[in-house]
């Protein structure tokens, strides 16, 4: 008899979605790689912000004056920037606890979100240093990204609670042989 392995398609689907998600994060945050001359110190100074909320408040302060006074355009830019940075790591906060037991604790998920976000910002800084790109390294992005991972984690917990309330089976663990139904922690 042939040795047949059972494939759990839900686990494989979640893992596949996670890989696709990581590829999309890399594509959105690091590509295209610009080819150009290294940035001058002056340009680099303008593309780094280590003061929390400084760029967000600066953008808010420019509503009505930047872009020829186009208020809606400026508000749209702020919403896209802040909202996009929050949305970026929501899937990480949702999927990490499903794939790895370590991230079932919120502090570990927050640390993962922080580590991923700081890594992205450092890679963008290196990109700016060596290619002359217009990428900005901003602590506000890190704050919004970490907030996104927290939101994703709470969506994960709410999903488990709703599934338990309605007696539904959910994929809660992809690193074991069997699907574990409902995490009651």
Locate each region found by the language model.
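A contiguous pocket-lining binding segment that forms or flanks enzyme active sites
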Residues: 145, 149
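Non-cytosolic membrane-interface motifs at loop->transmembrane helix junctions
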Residues: 133-143
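Bulky hydrophobic segments
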Residues: 1-134, 150-185
């Amino acid at each position: 008899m042939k040795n047949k392995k059972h494939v759990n398609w839900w686990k494989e689907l979640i893992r596949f979605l996670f890989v696709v998600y990581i590829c999309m994060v890399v594509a959105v945050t690091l590509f295209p790689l610009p080819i150009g001359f290294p940035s001058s110190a002056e340009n680099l100074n303008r593309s780094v912000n280590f003061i929390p909320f400084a760029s967000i408040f600066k953008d808010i302060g420019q509503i009505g004056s930047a872009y020829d006074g186009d208020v809606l355009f400026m508000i749209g830019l702020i919403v896209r920037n802040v909202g996009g940075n929050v949305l970026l790591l929501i899937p990480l906060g949702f999927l990490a606890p499903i794939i790895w037991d370590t991230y079932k604790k919120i502090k570990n998920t927050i640390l993962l979100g922080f580590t991923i976000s700081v890594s992205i910002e450092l890679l963008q800084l290196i990109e700016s240093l060596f290619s002359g790109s217009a990428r900005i390294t901003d602590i506000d992005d890190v704050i919004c990204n970490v907030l996104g991972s927290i939101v994703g984690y709470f969506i994960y917990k709410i999903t488990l609670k709703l599934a338990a309330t309605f007696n539904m089976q959910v994929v809660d663990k992809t690193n074991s042989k069997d699907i574990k139904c409902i995490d009651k922690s």
